[in-house]
Regions:
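Compact, glycine-rich, soluble single-domain proteins
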Residues: 7-43, 48, 52-53, 68
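C-terminal structural segments of small proteins and small subunits
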Residues: 51-83
Length: 83
């Protein structure tokens, strides 16, 4: 299991278009992907879950990935969120 704190670099945060791209990327992996903000967590492969967290640019989220392809998933998703 990998767990990382990531500062959101996307100008619009994780709103509809960016959240959809994140879900699309996350869905390519077999690993379990959770996104946490404060005390709340959401399935990283769920558009509604991500949108419910209301993630803005500059906020720090926790990305938790568990599975056999967790290393590749963490690298790609961390790069996506922080750019």
């Amino acid at each position: 299991m990998l767990k990382r704190e990531i500062e959101i670099g996307k100008e619009q945060g994780l709103k509809s278009k960016t959240a959809a791209l994140f879900v699309q990327k996350a869905s390519l992996y077999k690993s379990s992907i959770l996104v946490g903000k404060g005390e709340r967590k959401a399935n990283g492969k769920s558009m509604l879950g991500l949108l419910s967290l209301v993630i803005e640019k500059g906020e720090t989220i926790t990305l938790i990935i568990d599975g056999f392809d967790e290393d590749r998933a963490m690298k790609e998703l961390e790069d996506f969120l922080s750019s």
